[in-house]
Amino acid sequence: MKESILAVLLYLFEYYFSENADLVRDRDSLQNGLIQVGFSPAEINKAFEWLDALAANRPTLTHPRVNGPVRVFHGPELDKLDVESRGFLLFLEQQGILNTEQRELVLDRAMALDQEELDLDDMKWVVLMVLFNQPGAEAAYAWMETQMFGNEPEPLH
């Protein structure tokens, strides 16, 4: 069974992190649970490395920049990220849901995935996982979660 890092991350996020946030699990028990549901140890390890890099690269700036430079995507980013996902990132930054450092962290984590291409749905999951890991980003996370799962999202002010 060929699985991707994103599939492992989505499974972790859906079954361990979001609904059971109070549940403390060590890496070994998480890995055993993932193996039991059919993920390969290699993909599980890559997913844990992805999460470690996410935790290690938390942005320090908590206030969004106003009227900053426009992000220009380049070579590998253009190849991997479709037009909708790139536009979505710019939209999130313009709306103040992501600041520039968070946007760059989302891009870093998206580029670290083992998929050749990421579509809009994949990008939304990456954004959600990054915001989940960001202290002080609760409102942005809630907005993004509503955008993905709920009714019409409320404007974020």
Swiss-Prot record:
Alphabetical list of PANTHER family matching this protein: PROTEIN SMG
Family of this protein: Belongs to the Smg family.
NCBIfam families: PRK03430.1
Name of the molecule in the record: Protein Smg homolog
Annotated organism of origin: Xylella fastidiosa (strain 9a5c)
Gene expressing this chain: smg
